[in-house]
UniProtKB/Swiss-Prot annotation:
Similarity section: Belongs to the velvet family. VeA subfamily.
PROSITE patterns: VELVET
Stretches for region Disordered: 41-61, 206-434, 448-517
Record protein name field: Developmental and secondary metabolism regulator veA
Naturally occurring in which organism (per UniProt): Fusarium oxysporum f. sp. lycopersici (strain 4287 / CBS 123668 / FGSC 9935 / NRRL 34936) (Fusarium vascular wilt of tomato)
Region (PEST): 431-462
Basic and acidic residues bias: start-end ranges: 244-253, 275-287, 382-391
Positions with biased composition (Basic residues): 217-229
Pfam families (UniProt xref): Velvet
Length: 532
């Protein structure tokens, strides 16, 4: 009993065609073709210069099944598809699904058939699944223009054995052994423009089965469809009842479309936390300054001066514990009537001009008790010990423990070669508090030990560098004198080394003169030859 053809359940989508022929040895052969997978949609690839590289294959790829049955009928015959010794190939052509009405003016473009690009021919592949048969697969078929089309598949056979030839050749144009057998057409499918193309769906189970057996088929694991809001009652006029709506319903359960923005559950709600509203600024006044803030690179600030002492027993108001840890904002107050006469200099630096500015901040409160400078003030001069670490790090030469004046010690720009430049002072700010700080007890800071002798930095003249020998050629003008006058009638430049005499000749016939590269004149002695 013959094995029946594997025909899917829905005959509308699976077109079947059969033919019967008799060979030279009176073998009765039946050819049955079935379109297992119909094309449904495609995107037009255009007809420009990039149309050949911009492929938009028909989705899903058409799959055609072929069976060869030997016997008096299909039902009683035997399936010899795998045993039949012949080659088959299927050729695809594109046709319009509806006849086009010719206009009044027949243009050449109107009569031309639609253009089908890609690979229109396919050889038969012998597969075991879904059933044992021969399959023709077209994974690379593209259409250039939009519209409603159908595909026509033509079957050609190349017979290898003479006993399988036809009794009479059917077509004389074909070479011997090549015969046209039959054709089959697909259902109409739509080709959309790039703007109207709805997208691609997930690959069918048949495409995945064929691809698993080694056939070249593109497989998509997800749905690439555009979500569009269609008008109620408006259907697809180009579908032509080809089962496109049925396939969309079959795959709608497996679609994984990204939810729209209108879905309230798809968007994360805004956090109700108000922690960012109560956040303090980054620049906190109580923050301890870092090393970068402690030693900024800009030029030195305006020179500070001392506040007028409220009493004779009060001296400079620095070194207080409340202002020794963190710097305070600088405040400059103009004191027109204050003049402080500096004491005699005890160190190697001379006092500079007085500054009318008053500085109330203390440079980071770093005090070194190694140097006892003098402190000039209206009160009796007392020795005290104070050192600014910032002064030591801002100079190039390490400071010596010699005696400095207080004014020259705290002024960072008090150098003999750089006089202070008047800087535009900011607007005077009112003092927050008129209360004065307690006077610093100098007696506890003064060391009874006599001041150390001044240590001067050992500076000397920079060593002279040896002259650099720059090699090079002497210029031609420094050795040879050239005349700028024009030369006529075979005249040549006159060599000043020879004067007016002939170049290279001397009164002695056995001696010659020549000019060397360094400009000197040298002589050469010729050999004497006597005529015999």
């Amino acid at each position: 009993m013959a094995t029946p053809s594997s025909i899917p359940a829905e005959p509308k989508r699976d077109v079947i065609n059969r033919i019967h022929r008799v060979t030279r040895e009176n073998r009765s052969l039946w050819y049955q073709m079935t379109v297992l997978q119909q094309p449904e949609r495609a995107r037009a690839c255009g007809s420009g210069s990039k149309a050949n590289s911009d492929r938009r294959p028909v989705d899903p790829p058409p799959v055609v099944e072929l069976r060869i049955i030997e016997g008096p009928s299909v039902e009683e015959g035997k399936d010899i598809t795998f045993d039949y010794n012949a080659n088959f190939f299927l050729y695809a052509s594109l046709e319009h699904a509806r006849p086009l009405a010719r206009g009044r003016v027949n243009t050449p473009a109107a009569g031309n058939p639609p253009i089908l690009t890609g690979v229109p021919a396919s050889g038969m592949a012998y597969l075991d699944r879904p059933t044992e048969a021969g399959y023709f697969i077209f994974p690379d078929l593209s259409v250039r223009h939009e519209g409603l089309y159908i595909l026509t598949f033509s079957l050609f056979e190349t017979t290898k054995e003479e006993r399988d030839y036809d009794l009479e050749p059917a077509d004389g144009d074909l070479p011997p052994g090549v015969d046209y057998r039959m054709e089959i057409k697909t259902e109409p499918f739509s080709v959309y423009s790039a703007k109207k193309f709805p997208g691609l769906m997930e690959s069918t189970q048949l495409s995945k089965t064929v691809a698993d057996q080694g056939c070249r088929v593109r497989i998509r694991r997800d749905v690439r469809m555009r979500k569009r809001e269609s008008k109620p009652g408006a259907g697809n006029s180009n579908s032509g009842g080809n089962g496109f709506e049925r396939r969309e319903e079959d795959f709608s359960r497996r679609r994984t479309i990204t939810p729209a923005s209108e879905d309230p559950h798809s968007i994360r709600n805004r956090s109700h936390s108000n922690s960012s509203e109560h956040r303090t600024p980054y620049t906190d006044a109580s923050r301890r300054p870092s090393m970068v803030d402690s030693y900024p690179p800009p030029p030195p600030p305006p020179p500070p001066s001392y506040e007028p002492a409220p009493s004779a027993s009060r001296h400079l108001d620095f070194g207080d514990s409340s202002a020794a840890q963190y710097p305070t904002p600088r405040q400059y107050a103009h004191q027109p009537g204050l003049q402080i006469t500096p004491g005699p200099p005890n160190g190697s630096y001379a006092p500079t001009a007085q500054s009318p500015y008053s500085k109330t901040d203390v440079p980071y409160g770093y005090v070194n008790r190694n140097i006892p400078p003098s402190c000039p003030s209206p009160a009796p001069s007392l020795k005290h010990e104070l050192y600014d670490r910032r002064q030591s790090t801002s100079t190039y030469v390490p400071p010596s423990p010699s005696v400095y004046s207080t004014e020259g010690h705290h002024r960072r720009d008090s150098r003999p070669s750089y006089p202070p430049t008047p800087v535009a002072a900011p607007h005077p700010r009112p003092m927050h508090s008129q209360t004065s700080l307690p006077a610093l007890k100098i007696d506890q800071l003064v060391s009874p030990v006599s001041p150390l002798p001044p240590i001067e930095p050992q500076t000397g003249p920079a060593p002279e560098l040896p002259p650099i020998n720059v090699g090079g050629k002497r210029k031609h003008e420094s050795v040879f004198a050239q005349s700028t006058r024009p030369l006529h009638n075979g005249q040549r430049q006159v060599d000043p080394h020879y004067g007016r005499s002939h170049r290279g000749y001397s009164p002695d016939h056995d001696q010659g003169w020549y000019s060397r590269a360094d400009g000197q004149i040298s002589s050469v002695q010729f050999n004497r030859y006597y005529d015999e």
